[in-house]
């Protein structure tokens, strides 16, 4: 099983962060891509590549609106060259990167077209762009392996897009095993419904809020800011909730209608405070090592091969965040190696 550290791009400490992830035996480092809230992601990823030798790297996640597909393809292909083959392109419909410039997440059809266009560019192909033959011509002079695309998905439409267009799909559904199993079933159903032959099914991952801590109630507070971000995807208007635990429906309603965009990612935001301990416990992986290992094993058993570990943020919780990352590396990762 792959374990990726989920971080925020900060030019001041990105090289230290990346080297620490590699030393702690994480497989990868994924950085948020939200231009109004943090440093430029691809510059930070390039610095991370220079500071490491085996750590996989990529945005977690970019979006189809703030960059033209050719720009995104060129940026990630350049990272692939700099890192000597360690790049993965994580992409979703857009959240804070879009609402901070007055836009909503892009529609599923626009998202699919963007992914299909990216695949053409990243495979070295060409396409007609307003009558012009458009291609990343410089790729011909490299030995780059093709960069895999990893679609971040919550609802059935985007899960279906990922299943049919991309090498990887990572669910943003929380850690409830039944919800994740529903996501896996949607992959299978999308392939079946398409009546198309695909060369291979995408590998499956999950973005999970995780904190290894002997005090489970403190762990819940440490992940509260991140749970607020990822749980509000399910609370958004139009989000599919047929598969959601009935006890959680009202919480998702509040996260959708009362989400405070100005306090995005803050545990003291009104929407974050609406979440009960029980909700956070279901949505995340928290508690002592044996509790976390049991839940991750159950998630692995349904076909999840990769986890992006969204731990407590260092800029919010300081040393406690560092300790949580180190405990995950010491107490959890070795269990799933070999």
Language-model-detected regions and their locations in the chain:
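Conserved, mostly hydrophobic/aromatic
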Residues: 25, 48, 79, 118, ...
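Short, acidic/polar
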Residues: 10-21, 75, 153-161, 289-298
């Amino acid at each position: 099983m792959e374990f990726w550290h989920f971080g925020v791009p900060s030019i001041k400490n990105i090289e230290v962060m990346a080297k620490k992830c590699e030393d702690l035996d994480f497989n990868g480092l994924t950085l948020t891509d939200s231009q109004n809230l943090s440093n430029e992601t691809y510059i930070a990823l390039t610095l991370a590549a220079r500071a490491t030798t085996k750590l996989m790297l990529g945005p977690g996640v970019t979006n189809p609106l703030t960059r033209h597909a050719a720009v995104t393809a060129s940026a990630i292909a350049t990272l692939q060259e700099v890192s000597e083959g360690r790049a993965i392109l994580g992409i979703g419909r857009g959240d804070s990167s879009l609402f901070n410039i007055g836009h909503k997440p892009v529609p599923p059809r626009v998202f699919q077209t963007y992914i299909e266009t990216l695949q053409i560019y990243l495979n070295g192909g060409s396409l007609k762009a307003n009558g012009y033959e458009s291609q990343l011509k410089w790729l011909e002079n490299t030995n780059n392996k093709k960069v895999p695309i990893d679609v971040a998905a919550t609802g059935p439409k985007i899960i279906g897009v990922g299943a049919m267009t991309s090498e990887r799909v990572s669910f943003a559904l929380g850690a409830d095993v039944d919800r994740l199993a529903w996501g896996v079933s949607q992959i299978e159903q999308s392939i079946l419904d398409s009546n198309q032959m695909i060369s291979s099914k995408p590998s499956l991952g999950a973005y999970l809020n995780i904190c290894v801590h002997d005090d489970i109630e403190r762990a819940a507070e440490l992940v509260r800011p991140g749970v607020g971000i990822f749980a509000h995807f399910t609370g958004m208007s139009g989000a599919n909730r047929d598969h959601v635990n009935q006890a959680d429906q009202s919480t998702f309603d509040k996260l959708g209608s009362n989400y405070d965009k100005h306090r995005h990612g803050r545990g003291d935001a009104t929407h974050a405070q609406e979440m009960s301990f029980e909700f956070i416990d279901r949505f995340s992986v928290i508690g002592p090592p044996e509790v976390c290992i049991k839940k991750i094993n159950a998630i692995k058993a349904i076909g999840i091969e990769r986890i992006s570990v969204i731990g407590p943020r260092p800029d919010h919780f300081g040393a406690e965040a560092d300790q949580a990352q180190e405990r995950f590396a010491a107490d959890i990762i070795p269990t799933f190696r070999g």
